[in-house]
């Protein structure tokens, strides 16, 4: 989907080794196209395989300068959270250019949805220090890109530029001590599985239907 492609593009922008690997893959694709018999159609790119190959590379920390953008396309280049600001990857700055409206959810979680396509629920999530998301599973796939701070769940700890994929086989409870800003994309609603949080499942379903019913 477009939403998941945006998340992957933002990850590549933040990760130096992934940018290099992506460039190598693009170069190979061009060479293959030039060498191929023009009469034979090219196979569709293996997005899942490419995603696995890119995100499996070791991540390096570096600073990059963004190219100047047109004045006709105002971008939300930063998000201000508490006492500091977070610079957004260019592709997310474009996604946020329509404006972000933050809503407080239970447990110190703040959410601002952005409309990218009509197949996925795309949102910025800010977890305040010491907060946690209720235990939940996924009815489909969820990709999460950490933009600032970090969080942990049953599978590990994640920091800036980390790119996670969860699916219906996974159940977890993200939590953070330091606070964390993420960009998340879901292709189906998440389902809380314990305690009073289960009462919010109808709301999750409604939010997903509303997010995917927008017209472009």
Language-model segments: which ranges?
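A short glycine-rich, His/Asp/Glu-containing loop-to-beta-strand
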Residues: 99-131
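Positively biased amphipathic helices and basic secretion/translocation or surface-docking motifs
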Residues: 2-4, 13-16, 20, 27-94
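Ligand-binding loop in jelly-roll beta-barrel domains
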Residues: 170-192
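Glycine- and acidic-residue-biased ligand/ion/polar-headgroup-sensing regions
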Residues: 128-131, 137-153
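Residue-level marker of beta-strand positions
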Residues: 17, 132, 162-163
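Alpha-helical membrane-targeting segments
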Residues: 10, 103, 189-216
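Short acidic-glycine-tyrosine-enriched beta hairpin
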Residues: 153-176
């Amino acid at each position: 989907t477009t939403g998941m492609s945006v998340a992957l593009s933002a990850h590549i922008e933040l990760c130096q080794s992934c940018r290099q690997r992506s460039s190598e893959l693009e170069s190979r694709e061009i060479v293959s196209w030039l060498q191929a018999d023009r009469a034979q159609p090219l196979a569709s790119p293996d997005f899942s395989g490419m995603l696995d190959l890119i995100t499996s590379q070791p991540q390096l920390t570096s600073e990059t300068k963004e190219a100047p953008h047109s004045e006709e396309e105002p971008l939300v280049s930063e998000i201000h959270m508490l006492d500091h600001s977070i610079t957004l990857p260019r592709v997310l700055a474009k996604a946020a250019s329509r404006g972000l409206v933050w809503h407080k959810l239970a447990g110190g979680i703040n959410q601002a949805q952005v409309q990218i396509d009509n197949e996925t629920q795309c949102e910025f999530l800010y977890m305040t220090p010491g907060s946690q998301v209720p235990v939940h599973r996924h009815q489909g796939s969820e990709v999460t890109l950490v933009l600032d701070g970090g969080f942990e769940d049953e599978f590990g700890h994640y920091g800036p530029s980390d790119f996670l994929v969860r699916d219906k086989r996974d159940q977890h409870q993200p939590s953070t001590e330091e606070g964390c800003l993420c960009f998340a994309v879901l292709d189906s609603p998440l389902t809380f599985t314990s305690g009073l949080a289960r009462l919010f499942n109808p709301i999750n379903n409604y939010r997903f239907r509303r997010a995917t019913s927008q017209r472009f």
